[in-house]
């Protein structure tokens, strides 16, 4: 492009140099100069304006005419969203407005301030002219809509209805027929459905007092019109200035917008145009408006949550009255209420839907007729072959032909009825699908809006500043996400705390501690034939920043979460069976418990093991792969003194069973887990159903418990983070001792973030010991009286701090409500039971894996020849993801899921039940709960008749 020529064109257009403009346009037409006739200025005097904008604004008619003749875009927008028509109307240049209209300038385009050309002009004559042109253009669109409906041109009809300013869907021709009338009497089914979905009223009558139903041609069209009585007409956006009452600020002027059943308010009109800086919103589901007779401008809206919002129409508002607002609010409230509370079909809709029994009966009748026809034809052919065509045979021959002919007619009639019955439902079912999609859209948008605003509110509360908009979720964790609170104990080495490691070397605890650290550092211990464990994965994880879990979940509203197929990018390269194996990372605590003689100290170690079992989940927001039915996993760790086998024993519901045992026969650890998922809108909660059992064989003791609830926050907006909460009750079934641990929810300002507290009690509920710490860091034990005294004093200090904050507004604004980095205060006399090992330096690039998790999917040729073909390590999609081959992992995951579905269908056809190989269902021997018990014989290595699942 010749920028110099463009600058000259802009300059001459601004100054009205018609001859120079004409010469430039001629050279451009001859291709002697390559320049854009719609170029935009870059200097201060013409920034973002085209030559046509400048000529219209400064009133140079000849220049405008030459530019339009040369092909300048008549509806081109400048940087403020104005068209040349906006500029000509604003400056009151009637002759230029008429010229632009001759070249089909669009009068309905809205600029950046939300105004059309007629709304920016100050000349009444120009406004009247633009209104007349607008009516003419609108009528042309209506005629095109009527023609498209008559001729069945669905594509053109859809394009017209999807315009920014669509024609009136209930417009009429000279006979009073609406587009729906036209589609009905021409039997254009798809056009009728589109019109109904766009708000066409099926109850309007033409000049002959006929509804569309009266003109409908064909049973299908009549059924569509009868079955769509509950359609709500398409809502138009309604907006304008309103005063809004506030408890703290009194009456403030906002630009208020009604759209899709939502009332939103903004500080300025341009903010509403671009949908930015929204100050608040309310969904109008079941909203009720009230007015005061003493004030013609005031009205109130009572929302579904019983909140009341007061609004006042500005007294100088000429175009909008209180009645206009009330009517618009009523329409949007009805729309939102309809789609947000339509839980079940009405009686009329139930009648429109043919039952499965009727469809089956119709099909069976058709099949019976078909079978009769086959028999008659066979007999007929046989008779022909045996017939010598004697005269005496002719009457019987003709009679048989009539029978066959009659059977054929009956078959055709039956099949036609059957086909009509099925096709009759198509329109109704398509419409119901559209309704559900619209309902889904409304609900998902409402949920996303609430979550986003709640997120902004909590962020503003944490930062101590007033919210930029009203209401969303757990934002202070974004501030915490980069903190090192989970590693704070590494800075507490100088604290004098009595620990099992310091006082119990004779119990062998140091030996187990050293063996664990040796393993994490890549030692030489043998495990499944691997001499030296890897310290990283073959490929780092892919960034998930460009992907949104909400974009997937919003399409799955109403589905069971366990059945939702997530893209592989949200996974981590481990099966859920391998994730379960991470319970064993701190096995030294079990060995330690087995070696202790005091039952209370044993309970302390078991409690520490139960807490440590969930520690690896911190920052592990990747989803493990769902195990396939029959999938197994084994792990042998000579260095840690255990071996484990697990199997996916059920697919729906998904249940994983595991069994681990000490290599020195000192313990057995087993259980079955069914992660029951719940979607709470802003978070996904996983409640691990199932009993965990630990048996200390040397003491003939058994402990049972269930894991806490795990919750992933900020599904819709913000950074994902994980929380564990709920009570965990560990029972010693021999002594009757009980340990009750409370995994605390974080609270609004994170004071209880990751905290775990509880007591060990005897069977008479006497407190024997207190436990406290964080599931991400450590666990301590202390005398219960000392702990209670500390808690009482801590509560008192907290209240004093709260009061002091309330006294100083400036302090409140400056203070960040984030927990102290050294967040576990060690009470004097405490005993350290467990402390988490630091994660490897490359953990953040390796799905936040611990050193223990890093080796779970490791495999070599020697191991491959030993493990069964159902082992997770041989699963191709997990292996591909571990190697960084995301596309292949996705393809393999899809292939395995389809293979699993096909196998399930084959079993259902053959009425064959699935049989688990290594576990069987039965009651837990200690609490009687339903459980999966290890059947034995896995370690004999006789792997015959294993299913082909990969």
From Swiss-Prot:
Positions of region (Disordered): 501-527, 795-816, 881-913
Span of domain PH: 235-334
An individual GO BP term: cholesterol metabolic process
One GO cellular component, as annotated: plasma membrane
Sequence motif: FFAT, positions: 469-485
Family to which this protein belongs: Belongs to the OSBP family.
Protein name: Oxysterol-binding protein-related protein 1
Source species: Homo sapiens
Gene, per the UniProt record: OSBPL1A
């Amino acid at each position: 492009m010749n920028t110099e020529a463009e600058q000259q064109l802009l300059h001459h257009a601004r100054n009205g140099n018609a001859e120079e403009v004409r010469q430039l346009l001629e050279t451009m037409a001859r291709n002697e100069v390559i320049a854009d006739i719609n170029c935009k200025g870059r200097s201060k005097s013409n920034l973002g304006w085209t030559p046509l904008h400048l000529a219209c604004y400064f009133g140079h008619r000849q220049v405008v005419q030459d530019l339009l003749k040369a092909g300048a875009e008549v509806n081109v927008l400048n940087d403020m969203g104005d068209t040349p028509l906006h500029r000509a109307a604003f400056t009151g240049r009637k002759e230029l407005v008429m010229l632009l209209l001759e070249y089909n300038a669009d009068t309905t385009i809205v600029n950046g301030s939300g105004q059309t050309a007629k709304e920016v002009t100050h000349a009444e004559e120009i406004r009247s002219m633009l209104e007349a042109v607008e009516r003419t253009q609108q009528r042309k669109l209506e005629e095109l809509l009527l023609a498209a409906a008559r001729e069945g041109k669905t594509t053109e009809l859809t394009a017209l209805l999807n315009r920014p300013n669509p024609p009136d869907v209930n417009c009429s021709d000279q006979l009073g027929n609406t587009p729906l009338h036209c589609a009905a009497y021409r039997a254009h089914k798809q056009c009728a459905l589109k019109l109904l979905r766009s708000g066409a009223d099926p109850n309007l009558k033409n000049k002959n007092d006929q509804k569309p139903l009266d003109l409908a041609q064909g049973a299908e069209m009549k059924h569509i019109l009868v079955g769509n009585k509950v359609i709500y007409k398409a809502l138009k956006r309604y907006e304008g200035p309103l005063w809004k009452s506030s408890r703290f600020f009194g009456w403030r002027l906002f630009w208020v917008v009604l759209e899709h059943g939502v009332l939103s308010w903004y500080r300025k009109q341009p903010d509403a145009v671009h949908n930015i800086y929204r100050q608040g919103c309310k969904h109008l589901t079941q909203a009720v408006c009230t007015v005061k007779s003493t004030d013609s401008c005031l009205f109130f809206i009572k929302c579904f949550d019983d909140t009341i919002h007061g609004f006042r129409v500005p007294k100088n508002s000429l175009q909008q009255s209180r009645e206009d607002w009330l009517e618009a609010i009523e329409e949007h409230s009805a729309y939102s209420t309809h789609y947000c509370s339509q839980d079940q079909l009405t009686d009329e809709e139930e009648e429109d839907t043919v039952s499965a029994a009727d469809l089956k009966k119709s099909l069976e009748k058709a099949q019976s007729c078909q079978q009769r026809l086959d028999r008659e034809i066979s007999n007929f052919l046989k008779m022909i072959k045996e017939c010598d065509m004697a005269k005496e045979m002719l009457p019987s021959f003709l009679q048989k032909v009539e029978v066959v002919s009659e059977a054929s007619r009956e078959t055709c009639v039956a099949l036609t009825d059957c086909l009509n019955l099925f096709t009759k439902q198509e329109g109704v079912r398509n419409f119901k699908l559209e309704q559900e999609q619209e309902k889904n859209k409304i609900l998902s948008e409402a949920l996303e809006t609430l979550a986003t605003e709640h997120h902004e509110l909590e962020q503003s509360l944490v930062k101590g500043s007033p919210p930029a908009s009203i209401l969303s979720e757990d934002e202070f964790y974004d501030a915490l996400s980069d903190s090192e609170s989970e590693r704070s104990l590494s800075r507490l080495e100088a604290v004098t705390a009595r620990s099992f490691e310091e006082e119990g070397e004779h119990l062998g605890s140091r030996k187990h501690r050293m063996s664990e650290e040796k393993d994490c550092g890549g030692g030489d211990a043998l495990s499944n034939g691997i001499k030296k464990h890897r310290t990283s994965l073959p490929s780092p994880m892919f960034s998930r920043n460009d992907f949104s879990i909400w974009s997937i979940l919003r399409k799955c509203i109403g589905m069971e979460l366990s059945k939702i197929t997530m893209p592989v990018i949200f996974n981590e390269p481990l099966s859920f069976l391998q994730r379960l194996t991470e319970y064993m990372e701190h096995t030294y605590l079990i060995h330690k418990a087995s070696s202790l003689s005091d039952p209370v100290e044993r309970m302390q170690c078991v409690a520490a093991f139960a807490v440590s079992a969930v520690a690896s989940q911190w920052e592990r927001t990747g989803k493990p792969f769902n195990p396939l039915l029959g999938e197994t996993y084994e792990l042998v760790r000579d260095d840690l003194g255990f071996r484990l086998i697990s199997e996916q024993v059920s697919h729906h519901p998904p249940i994983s069973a595991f069994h681990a045992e000490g290599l020195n026969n000192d313990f057995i650890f087993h259980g079955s887990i069914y992660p029951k998922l719940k979607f709470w809108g802003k978070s996904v909660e996983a409640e691990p159903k199932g009993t965990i059992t630990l048996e200390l064989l040397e003491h003939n003791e058994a402990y049972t418990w269930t894991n806490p609830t795990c919750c992933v926050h900020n599904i819709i907006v913000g950074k994902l983070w994980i929380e564990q909460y709920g009570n965990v009750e560990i029972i010693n079934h021999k002594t009757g001792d009980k340990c009750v641990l409370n995994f605390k929810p974080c609270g609004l300002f994170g004071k209880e973030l990751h905290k775990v507290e509880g007591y060990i009690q005897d069977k008479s509920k006497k407190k024997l010991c207190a436990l406290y710490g964080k599931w991400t860091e450590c666990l301590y034990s202390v005398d219960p009286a000392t702990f209670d005294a500390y808690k009482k004093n801590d509560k008192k200090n907290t209240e004093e701090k709260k009061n002091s904050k309330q006294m100083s507004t400036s302090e409140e604004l400056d203070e960040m409500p984030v927990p102290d980095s050294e967040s576990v205060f060690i009470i004097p006399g405490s005993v350290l039971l467990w402390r988490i090992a630091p994660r490897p330096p490359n953990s953040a690039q390796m799905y936040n894996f611990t050193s223990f998790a890093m080796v779970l999917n490791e495999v070599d040729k020697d191991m491959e020849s030993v493990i069964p073909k159902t082992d997770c390590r041989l699963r191709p999609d997990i292996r591909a993801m571990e190697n960084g081959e995301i596309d292949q992992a996705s393809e393999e995951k899809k292939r395995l899921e389809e293979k699993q579905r096909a196998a399930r269908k084959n079993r259902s056809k053959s009425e064959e039940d699935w049989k688990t190989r290594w576990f069987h269902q039965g009651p837990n021997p200690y609490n009687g709960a339903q459980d999966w018990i290890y059947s034995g014989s896995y370690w004999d290595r006789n792997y015959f008749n294993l299913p082909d699942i990969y």
